[in-house]
């Protein structure tokens, strides 16, 4: 899939800095959970989920940042994409979010979390390009 087929939804400020104008980035200063909700809304509009919303080894409650790749164009509702994002939202609801505690005690960890999220997204973009 070329860049014209992908859109990144993120709350990570590093992502729009790292991607050029050929990439469509939907950046908002929102919570991790709100990113997933925004992705779910786009899936209901007919976009496809192109990266897993719970990718990586950092638990959702331990990082404030999330980037998810979806198709740029909408089609009909994809039940598999919807099932995956709804499962991710249910999983997140089980966690008590700890990331705000890091802000007070270790603000430098937020840069680390941004980099981890960016690396996961970069890998997803590269994998999608192989399709």
Predicted regions and their residues:
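Internal alpha-helical scaffold of NAD(P)-dependent oxidoreductase catalytic cores
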Residues: 34, 41-42, 71-131
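Short, polar loop motifs at secondary-structure junctions
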Residues: 9-16
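Short basic, glycine-rich beta-strand/loop surfaces that mediate nucleic-acid
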Residues: 61-74
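Residues in well-ordered beta-strands of folded domains
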Residues: 9, 26, 69-71
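Short, small-residue-biased leader/transition segments that mark boundaries at the very start
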Residues: 1-5
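Structural motif
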Residues: 6-8, 47-49, 67
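Short, aromatic/basic amphipathic alpha-helical patches
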Residues: 17-22
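Rossmann-like NAD(P)(H) cofactor-binding subdomain of soluble oxidoreductases
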Residues: 23-63
């Amino acid at each position: 899939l070329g860049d014209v087929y992908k859109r990144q939804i993120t709350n990570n400020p590093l992502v729009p800095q790292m991607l050029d104008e050929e990439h469509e980035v939907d950046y908002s200063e929102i919570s991790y959970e709100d990113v997933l909700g925004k992705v779910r809304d786009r899936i209901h509009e007919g976009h496809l989920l192109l990266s897993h919303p719970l990718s990586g080894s950092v638990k959702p409650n331990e990082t404030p940042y999330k980037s998810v790749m979806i198709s740029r164009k909408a089609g009909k509702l994809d039940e598999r994409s919807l099932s995956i994002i709804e499962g991710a939202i249910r999983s997140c609801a089980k966690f008590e979010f700890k990331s705000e505690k890091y802000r007070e005690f270790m603000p430098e960890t937020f840069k680390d979390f941004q980099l981890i999220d960016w690396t996961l997204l970069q890998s997803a973009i590269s994998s999608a390009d192989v399709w």
